[in-house]
Structure formats: structure tokens, C-alpha cells
UniProtKB/Swiss-Prot annotation:
This is tRNA N6-adenosine threonylcarbamoyltransferase. Disulfide bonds: none annotated. Required for the formation of a threonylcarbamoyl group on adenosine at position 37 (t(6)A37) in tRNAs that read codons beginning with adenine. Is involved in the transfer of the threonylcarbamoyl moiety of threonylcarbamoyl-AMP (TC-AMP) to the N6 group of A37, together with TsaE and TsaB. TsaD likely plays a direct catalytic role in this reaction. The gene is tsaD. Its cofactor is Fe(2+). NCBIfam families: gcp_kae1, T6A_TsaD_YgjD. Its main location: cytoplasm. It comes from Lactococcus lactis subsp. cremoris (strain MG1363). CDD domains: ASKHA_NBD_TsaD_bac (cd24133). GO terms for cellular component: cytoplasm. Belongs to the KAE1 / TsaD family. Binds 1 Fe(2+) ion per subunit.
Length: 341
């Protein structure tokens, strides 16, 4: 049987990435050009800057991927690309590159939901036993997705306001940390204690929904009130502040994930998205999820990368190209959700 090679593009935010996946499981390369240093001084991603960097890096990444994988264009089976959700201009760079490459090399084009990519990154680590539940947490999303069978996605819960990663970045700015601040907060949290008892929103409801805006506001108000009293709590108690914030976030994520698994019994729990790199969350999951198979991707697959897009595209390819193939009129879908698939 002829080998399947998928060339995938990911440019939804601030990482330019191109990957090649063999037979749905062997990641031959996963080239990632990060833009963190360009956005750091602004305290967050600047869409126009992100798009310009994608334009500069995309061709370099394609060439690097083909060279590292030792694959030529005529060996490829299909081209895959993130169509959304994400930043419109950033998405368009990847889509135009993918369409051009597919057209020039007479290859089918497979559009992929970015969040399905985060979910299917787990398939590059271990075999997913269905049905499965996925906790997807990042700077822009916090949602729980039920996967009854391969390629079937049903969002069963999401945040009502801020995403978990967004809360981390906003709290990080108050703490005086540089963007992105999630890793530093995680490191500080491991040195402190939960002494401030920040609110855990919706913990006692039976709704599979998150809310982090109240926690963020409580953190900001505490810092402000302490400063008014002459207590520079950021300077004097940073580690305990970080620990208190992180424990509150993880408590909510764990509670709602367990609730979702009660409502939708599963064999596997998957974690994905940038916040899945958080050691506090990974430790709690490993300690408390014992009855179901737990798949936590390695750090290299937690952030945005084209390898995960290739993995999701392979699942789509198995459905039959007549059902999933896009035309050259494919456009960006910045607000794409699972229900649109």
C-alpha cells in the first residue's frame, strides 16, 4: 500500500509552522518559527505584525520541512491548512500558501479546524480509545469536546468570558511579567501556597461551563486594595499570589472536566492547547484521572504547530476526499467553531 504523506500549514496566530506526517502517525518534521520576541514588548499578539512575519517565514518553513523530511512534492498525498479559528490576516497567509502549493503540485486541499488540531495532537502520542473527552485550553479558548468516535466532535462546554490562557496573560501583566507569562506564573506557583483563596466561579453548578473573568477581577482588585494600604503585594508576596491564582484556575478546570465526564462517560481524556503545558494542571490530571486513559501531549505539541493540523487532516482524509476536500476558493474563518464542521 502506498504511503500517505500530508503537508500541513498552521498560521492561525503567532507561530508559522509547516509539518509533514507519514501514515497518520509518524511526524517526519514539524518546523515552527516563533514570533514571541516581536510581540513581547506589546504585551500580546499584534495581528498586523503576526501577518507580516508569516509572509516572511512561510516559504522558509516549507523548504525546511521538505528538506528535513527528505520528501519531494510528488510524494505527497495531500495538503492541509488551518482555516480557523484565529486571526484573519494570519490565517490568510497560510491558506494562500497552502492553496498555491496544492494547485502547483496537483494535490487535494484539506481544511482543518485549529481546535480539532489541538485535540488530535494526542493521536501523535498514543492511541485514542473512543469515546473520548478533550479539555482544550489556550489563550483564546477553554472548551470541553466530546468525541464519540474518530472524526466526530461535539462541544459540550466552554468559557462564558475569558479563556484560561487569557486570564493568565492579563494577571501576568498585573504582576509585571513579560508576555507570554503562563510559564513564569506556573514556576512561581510551585514555590508558593494558596493563601488568598480566590473565587472559583460556577463550581457548584451543574453546567459544563467555565468563567475566569471574576477570578481575574478579584486578583486585580486585591493587588489594588493592598497597594492602597501601602502593601506592595507584588513585590512582597509574588509566589503566593501566583500559587493562589493557579490553584483557582486548575480547580475550576478539574471540576468541570470531571462533570463533563460524568455526563458523557468516556474511555480517554485528552488535554490540548497552550495551557496544557502548565505543570500544575498536568500534575492534577495525572493524580486525579485514574479510571480513564489520560493523554497529555509533550510540550512541543502543546502550542500551535502544523503537526497537529496534519494529524487532524489525516482523520478527515480517511472520510474520503469527496467529503472533505476544499476548492481554491477556500477562505479564512476566524470565528470557526466545531458546530460549523
Amino acid at each position: 500500500m502506498k504511503d500517505n504523506y500530508i503537508l500541513a500549514f498552521e498560521t492561525s496566530c503567532d507561530e508559522t509552522s509547516v509539518a509533514i506526517l507519514k501514515n497518520g502517525s509518524e511526524l517526519l518534521c514539524n518546523i515552527i518559527a516563533s514570533q514571541i520576541n516581536s510581540h513581547k514588548r506589546f504585551g500580546g499578539v499584534v495581528p498586523e505584525i503576526a501577518s507580516r512575519h508569516h509572509v516572511e517565514q512561510i516559504t522558509v518553513c516549507i523548504e525546511a520541512a521538505l528538506e528535513e523530511a527528505e520528501i519531494s512534492a510528488d510524494q505527497l498525498t495531500a495538503v492541509a491548512v488551518t482555516e480557523g479559528p484565529g486571526l484573519n490576516g494570519a490565517l490568510l497567509v497560510g491558506i494562500m500558501a497552502a492553496k498555491t502549493f496544492a494547485w502547483a503540485n496537483h494535490l487535494p486541499l484539506i481544511p482543518v479546524n485549529h481546535m480539532a488540531g489541538h485535540l488530535m495532537a494526542a493521536s501523535l502520542v498514543d492511541t485514542i480509545e473512543y469515546p473520548a473527552m478533550a479539555l482544550l485550553v489556550s489563550g483564546g479558548h477553554s472548551e470541553l469536546v466530546y468525541v464519540e468516535k474518530e472524526g466526530s466532535y461535539k462541544k459540550v462546554g466552554e468559557t462564558r468570558d475569558d479563556a484560561a490562557g487569557e486570564a493568565y496573560d492579563k494577571v501576568g501583566r498585573v504582576m509585571g511579567l513579560t508576555y507570554p507569562s503562563g510559564k513564569v506564573i506556573d514556576e512561581l506557583a510551585h514555590k508558593g501556597q494558596d493563601t488568598y483563596n480566590f473565587p472559583r466561579a460556577m463550581m457548584n453548578t451543574h453546567e459544563v461551563e467555565f468563567s475566569f473573568s471574576g477570578l481575574k477581577s478579584a486578583f486585580i482588585n486585591l493587588v489594588h486594595n493592598e497597594n492602597q494600604k501601602g502593601n506592595d503585594v507584588i513585590a512582597n508576596d509574588l509566589e503566593n499570589l501566583a500559587a493562589s491564582f493557579q490553584v483557582a484556575v486548575v480547580d475550576v478546570l478539574m471540576a468541570k472536566t470531571k462533570l463533563a465526564m460524568e455526563k458523557y462517560p468516556v474511555k480517554t481524556l485528552i488535554i490540548g492547547g497552550g495551557v496544557s503545558a502548565n505543570q500544575g494542571l498536568r500534575e492534577r490530571l495525572s493524580a486525579e484521572i485514574t479510571d480513564e486513559k489520560l493523554i497529555i501531549p509533550p510540550l512541543r505539541l502543546c502550542g500551535d504547530n502544523a503537526g497537529m493540523i496534519a494529524a487532524a487532516a489525516y482523520i478527515e482524509w480517511k472520510k474520503g476526499l469527496e467529503n472533505v476536500q476544499a476548492g481554491l476558493d477556500l477562505n479564512a474563518k476566524p470565528s470557526l467553531v466545531f458546530e460549523d464542521m
